[in-house]
């Protein structure tokens, strides 16, 4: 654990906070960046009082809440080693993808519902989108009747998932559709400082909050109470990245960026521009934005 005698302004803000919030945005496989950030936060003695996560960030948030961040890299490794395509799944789920099944297996092994329900578990709010009106809804994973279904709901996005999870009679979908950067919710929950971890590179423009706000500007009233940790440039990992060396590199990049932002260190490794897969990455972002934007269109009456 690092405890500098004269902490940087960012670290001083986080350590002096009476109620620190942590917000983990979505980003699919790019959320591997968050793994390194979480490791660094814990090493520096930064202990959030609340975590809010959406979409791909919910799996990392669940590990933090359950106290299993030390197992996160193995969690991701196990997930990526499982076959994610199965033609037979077309008959069962109307999709060749097995992501729901893989998530169920790895979550049970590396996190577990019972750990989320322990008294010492970190409060974890999962953001989902209520599909009938496209509104953001936040549910506490610790008290949810079925936490895993809640986590899957925050990731629901066709064609990777074909059946929208139903919770208490309502159908829910990807939490990033309604708000990919729910930091205002953290302040509304009484947090006096917030760490926001998101995956859009600084050189790509302001953070991505959603299809209607792809270049979000954080209001000044929030900026002074926030520490935003994001890559310098577009990540090499694609949204559907499965190459373990690339994901491992992204995790390590998260560690270094967290130290740069929080401690003021300088690491040349973080200033490397992504080269391979640039076109695929751009096309993936455009496709995802189009899918999410289509999901926000109001349904015709009747």
Question: What is each PLM-predicted segment?
Answer:
Residues 1-54, 62-302:
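Patatin-like phospholipase
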């Amino acid at each position: 654990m690092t405890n500098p005698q004269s902490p940087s302004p960012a670290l001083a803000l986080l350590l002096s906070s009476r109620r620190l919030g942590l917000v983990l945005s979505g980003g699919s496989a790019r959320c591997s960046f968050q793994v390194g950030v979480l490791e660094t936060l814990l090493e520096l003695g930064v202990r959030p009082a609340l975590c809010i996560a959406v979409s791909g960030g919910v799996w990392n948030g669940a590990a933090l809440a359950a106290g299993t961040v030390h197992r996160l890299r193995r969690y991701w490794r196990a997930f990526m080693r499982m076959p994610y395509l199965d033609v037979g799944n077309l008959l069962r789920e109307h999709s060749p993808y097995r992501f729901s099944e893989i998530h169920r297996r790895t979550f049970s092994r590396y996190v577990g519902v019972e750990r989320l329900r322990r008294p010492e578990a970190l409060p974890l709010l999962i953001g989902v989108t209520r599909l009938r009106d496209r509104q953001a809804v936040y549910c506490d994973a610790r008290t949810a009747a079925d936490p895993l279904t809640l986590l899957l709901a925050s990731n629901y996005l066709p064609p990777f998932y074909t059946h929208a999870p139903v919770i208490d009679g309502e159908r829910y979908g990807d939490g990033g559709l309604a708000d990919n950067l729910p930091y205002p919710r953290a302040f509304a929950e009484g947090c006096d400082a917030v760490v926001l971890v998101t995956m859009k590179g600084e050189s790509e423009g302001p953070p991505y909050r959603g299809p209607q706000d792809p270049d979000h500007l954080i209001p000044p009233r929030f900026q002074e109470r926030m520490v935003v940790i994001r890559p310098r440039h577009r990540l090499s990992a694609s949204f559907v990245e499965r190459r373990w060396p690339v994901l491992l590199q992204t995790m390590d990049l998260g560690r270094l960026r967290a130290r740069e932002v929080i401690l003021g260190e300088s690491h040349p490794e973080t200033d490397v521009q992504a080269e391979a897969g640039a076109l695929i990455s751009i096309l993936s972002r455009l496709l995802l934005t189009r899918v999410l934007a289509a999901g926000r269109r109001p349904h015709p009456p009747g």
